[in-house]
């Protein structure tokens, strides 16, 4: 039985197929939790996997669907309305006419001084700085970049202060504040326009779970604070702080369509091999634009290709898991009342035997990104691809990924020995050798009219998909993979 790498031509008959799938998903609009767009995307994936002969299973959940429809900040007293760059998801809602109250500025999110008498009945303004943050990878397994660029040492999207901001929002609500206005600093309006942040606080699924004394994983209750909040770009800071210093009133409006117990599903599609040993490919279904998240489209394209191979050429079973709940504060059981674990924590909870047969797990997200750089008050394309990050603690997996990338248009990719993030993390925690793969550009979380489809490189998208296919074929032939 041969497990040699398979060429792109052999696996992707139509070079535009992956892009077509991504474009079709982007045309649905933001796939927010519980939205009609997400439900339609789930249908596309389930139907597509089944059409290729895979066994498809749906793991049902419910979520609180919270879709904003109108948001603004009017300063009054002849001042121009503030340019609101976005809203804080699931923060809270105002009446249709908005909430009018005096403004008060309390400093920076990390050291804001919340004094009840100064907060009560006011709209609270706080600075939210965008700072550089070191990557912090312990070691680098290798770099695939034919241009031999300088390897990045900092995260492109900077520090995310989601946790202190959420904690501050709770303190402001407890002190009687009626709204929160977070002002971006250290960036430009264009860079932060439309950002859907935070996707949930805390920002990692692992923080929504805990281990019991019996060694079982369970949901960790997460309190919800109903306090409407919006983001303002840096160009509006001076006017906003001047209004606050003058004790002026402003009107904050944040209206949303809220539906409890909206149905969602994780999709598990299985392509059988000659043995029960499994290679697991994971991504999430919910996302805000063509880049975040296009992993489901990539996995479907991979499944279509791999399903064309004869069974006897597939030693191991391949599991494609497109999980839900990545962008939710809470996910519930189908009763709509009982909080539960979702994403891959939920997958492993509902399918405890999966970890025992999994020989490797590959988390696939944010494929095909291009590089955009800040130039003054604008963001412009550099004409190059953005860096992709491939993280694994396994030297074997690092070697597989570097060889799979070689000779493709996937670069630049940094393959590092670093903490497994996001979807592959739960597999790594239970001892399954894992890889986290994806780009992390600053525009990753933006909702835009064109879904940032134009920031996807068709060439790179196809190349990365092919590299991942090559990696899967290589993993199929390795007898044992060290964690």
Task: Identify the residue ranges that each predicted region occupies.
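Second-shell loop/turn segments in exported
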Residues: 5-12, 26-36, 101-105, 138-140, ...
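His/Asp/Glu-rich mid-to-C-terminal helical/loop segments that flank catalytic regions of hydrolases
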Residues: 304, 316-319, 442-483
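Metal-dependent peptidase/peptidase-like ectodomains
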Residues: 274-276, 323-430, 434
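Noncatalytic luminal/extracellular "stalk/propeptide" segments of secretory-pathway proteins
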Residues: 2-3, 12-16, 20-145
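Extracellular/luminal Protease-associated
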Residues: 83-219
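Zn-dependent metallopeptidase/amidohydrolase metal-coordination segment
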Residues: 413-465
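Soluble metallo-hydrolase cores and metallopeptidase-like ectodomains found primarily
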Residues: 85, 89-116, 205-293, 301-312
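Acidic, glycine-rich active-site loops and adjacent beta-strand->loop/helix elements
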Residues: 130, 186-187, 285-287, 321-329, ...
